[in-house]
Amino acid sequence: MDDKYFREDQWSISPYNFEESVLKRLELPSNVKIHDATLRDGEQTPGVVFRKEDKVRIARLLDEVGVDRIEAGMPAVSGEDFQAMKEITASGLKAEIFSFARALTGDIDKAVECGCTGVVIEIPIGYPKLVHQFGWTWEDVLRKSVNCLKYARKK
C-alpha cells in the first residue's frame, strides 16, 4: 500500500507533521546537521554485528554522502569497537566523529583516547531501574549527570 505518508518497505511519516497547528509553530533552522547513529544503534538490532572493517567502510560511505556527524560506537564496550573508532577518527573524514558513552568518566576517557570530536552521554532515568537496580535517587541522577558533563567539557 502506497500513499503520501507511507511507501511499503521504504519509508513512512506521520500525517500529524502536516497538521496546521504543527506547521504554524514550525521554525526550521537555517543550518541542519545530520547525526547518524547507524554504527552504534544499528548493532543493537538482533543478529547484527559489525566487524571493525565494516564500521570503517560504513563510516567512509556516510562521510561520502555528506553526513555531518557519525556516532561511531561505544569504545568502552570492546577492544574491537575501540580500535574501529580509533581508525575512523584517524582516517581524515570530513564528518565529526562522536562516541556514545555512559555517564562514567572512564567512558569519556575512552572517547577522548579514540580522538572523537564529541560524545553522546546517556544516564538511566527509568524509575524501576534507578531505584531497584542502582539504588539511586533523582538527586543522584542529577549529581552524576552534572559531574559527568563537567568532566566531558574539560576533556
Q: At which residue positions do the language-model features occur?
A:
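An N-cap/entry alpha-helix motif that binds or orients negatively charged groups
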Residues: M1-L23
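Alpha-helix-loop-beta-strand connector modules within alpha/beta enzyme cores
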Residues: F18, S78-R102, D140-K155
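N-terminal small/glycine-rich loop or linker at the start of catalytic domains
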Residues: L23-V48, V120-F134
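Hydrophobic faces of well-ordered beta-strands that scaffold small-molecule active sites
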Residues: K33-A37, D68-A72, A95-A101, T117-I121
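Non-membrane alpha-helical structural segments and their capping/turn regions in soluble enzymes
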Residues: V49-V56, F82, G135-V146
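Catalytic domains of carbohydrate-active enzymes, especially glycoside hydrolases
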Residues: D54-G73, K110-G118
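Glycine-rich, proline-tolerant flexible connector loops at the mouths of alpha/beta enzymes
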Residues: V67-L93, I123-W136
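Hydrophobic, small-residue-rich alpha-helical packing segments that form membrane-like cores
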Residues: T105-K155
